[in-house]
Design a protein with these regions (language model features):
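C-terminal membrane-cytosol helix-exit motif in multi-pass small-molecule transporters
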Residues: 3-31
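Juxtamembrane intracellular "pre-TM" segments in multi-pass secondary transporters
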Residues: 26-54
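C-terminal transmembrane helical hairpin of 12-TM major facilitator-type secondary transporters
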Residues: 68, 86, 92-98, 102-163
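Cytoplasm-facing, short amphipathic helices at loop-to-helix transitions on the intracellular side
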Residues: 52, 114, 170-174
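Interfacial helix-cap and linker-helix signal at transmembrane-aqueous boundaries
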Residues: 1, 77-78, 108-109, 194-202
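Small-residue-rich transmembrane alpha-helices and their cytosolic helix-loop interfaces
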Residues: 1, 59, 91, 95, ...
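A late C-terminal transmembrane helix in Major Facilitator Superfamily
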Residues: 154, 165-202
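Extracytoplasmic gate region of multi-pass secondary transporters
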Residues: 47-107, 157, 191
């Protein structure tokens, strides 16, 4: 707790640097004098933009999947006779390989089409889940599933934010990424709640 308190306290002096003048690119002079749109105007544009809606819905499913697996898979493994250590190692593998997957997704997003990469990512995630359910449950399949899902876990985030920036520009990235992330959290809620409800009913 002491270390955490020190790290949190460091935010105050570091935030002072945010008072520096905002950098303005040379080609931004033409747009600098345009009046900034408010939240309502941006929201109207976004809700009428079908690719943005589909992107948000995809992120909703992403939230459902990661929370459903993160919360309920360890209990599912225990119900099928595996030790709690197996579930712990699964989550550790997801967390470890998530670092690799997220970094790699961001790097690839700079070089290739972000929408296509995101499509492949969601597709591979779906196929991985189907394969896990179809194969016999063993320590090998559980750990392999953890590694692959870790690579695909939050690698959606840099690609999704990059697509939002490409759609509307970086000026409104924070606002619109927040809206997309809100749908992710809605999916997360249902992933946790419906999984527990199904367990209690069945």
């Amino acid at each position: 707790l002491l270390i955490t308190s020190v790290l949190v306290a460091l935010i105050v002096p570091l935030a002072w640097m945010l008072k520096a003048p905002m950098y303005q690119a040379p080609n931004a002079v033409a747009t600098a004098n345009k009046p900034a749109m408010g939240f309502k105007e941006i929201l109207v544009i976004a809700k009428n933009h079908k690719p943005f809606i589909w992107l948000a819905l995809g992120f909703l499913v992403c939230g459902f999947q990661v929370v459903f697996l993160g919360i309920h898979l360890p209990g599912y493994l225990t119900d099928h006779g595996f030790s709690t250590t197996t579930g712990t190692v699964f989550l550790a593998l997801v967390g470890l390989f998530n670092i690799v997957g997220t970094y790699t997704a961001g790097w690839l997003g700079d070089k290739y089409s972000k929408p296509k990469l995101l499509m492949w990512l969601y597709g591979l995630r779906g196929l991985t889940i189907i394969a896990f359910l179809a194969l016999p449950l063993s320590t090998w399949t559980i750990y392999s599933f953890g590694i692959i899902m870790g690579l695909l876990w939050l690698s959606t985030v840099p690609l999704t934010n990059g697509i939002v920036a490409n759609m509307f520009g970086v000026k409104y990235l924070t606002m619109l990424s927040g809206i997309v992330f809100f749908t992710h959290q809605i999916g997360s809620f249902f992933g946790g709640w419906l999984g527990g409800l199904n367990h209690d009913i069945t």
